[in-house]
Amino acid sequence: MKNWIVGMVALVTMVPVMAATPWQKITHPVAGSPQSIGGFANGCVIGAQPLPLESADYQVMRSDQRRYFGHPDLLNFIHRLSAQAHQQQLGTVLIGDMAMPAGGRFSSGHASHQSGLDVDIWLQLPKQRWSQQQLLKPQPIDLVAVDGKRVIPALWQPQIESLIKLAAKDNDVTRIFVNPAIKKQLCLDAGADRQWLHKVRPWFAHRAHMHVRLRCPANSLECVDQDTPPPGDGCGAELESWFQPPPPSAKPGKTLPPPLPPSCQALLDNHFATE
């Protein structure tokens, strides 16, 4: 577990310094029947749709970055979740990064979010809708204490757990990544209803948002799903291992991104050949 964590730290710290990618130059979705292609961290999407920026139930942050595209299944999930949150009077759901118009690799900020099936949702639920200025330059609330071992009690709200639980109980959701301290708090608060917790996975950072991932759509034949999370609530030894100091390791070297799935490479080639 520890060696795997150290390796993944190297990957996470590498992402922000990756070079610009051609995917950022594609400003509109690729026409075609919606298809998520490849893996979540090495893929693309055909027929992506933009999440409507106007909704009574949610607001989209940093829309100027044009990261609000996804497979229709992802848009449907966001509509379902935000409607449920509205019905339960949790507050306004704040939508962060989804995917770029054709998916693909980001130059910074994410290793995944490439196949149109990932969305970041902030773990704050304002009662008052944000202004356009707040949405363009949002200020996250760090819920995790400095020592990284617990949430800050004054910032933790029951509505946050309710939002995560609603997302985890959605049939299309396979994983929700949160900071280990947030997972720990969910384990403490869950009570007898714990089945949903196995989808909530501890991960680096994620101190102010949850990263929700959907299963591959049934008609996306080239989409690569992850293995199902292990059974159980994930609140035992695996979770505790995240709070142990990592062993010393050599400084990681630079690694090149893997080759694209052939269909994604063909998509890029065709797009730039017709420019």
From Swiss-Prot:
Region (Disordered): 227-262
Compartment(s): Periplasm
GO CC, one annotated term: outer membrane-bounded periplasmic space
Signal peptide stretch: 1-19
The protein's required cofactors: Zn(2+)
Residues engaged in binding Zn(2+) 1: H110, H113, D120, H211
One MF term in the entry's GO annotations: serine-type endopeptidase activity
EC number: 3.4.24.-
Domain of life the protein comes from: Bacteria
Keyword Aminoacyl-tRNA synthetase carried by entry: no
Record note on cofactor: Binds 2 Zn(2+) ions per subunit. Zn(2+) ion 1 is bound in the active site. Zn(2+) ion 2 is bound at the dimer interface by residues from both subunits.
UniProt function note: Murein endopeptidase that cleaves the D-alanyl-meso-2,6-diamino-pimelyl amide bond that connects peptidoglycan strands. Likely plays a role in the removal of murein from the sacculus.
Protein name: Penicillin-insensitive murein endopeptidase
Organism: Yersinia pestis bv. Antiqua (strain Antiqua)
Lineage of the organism: Bacteria, Pseudomonadati, Pseudomonadota, Gammaproteobacteria, Enterobacterales
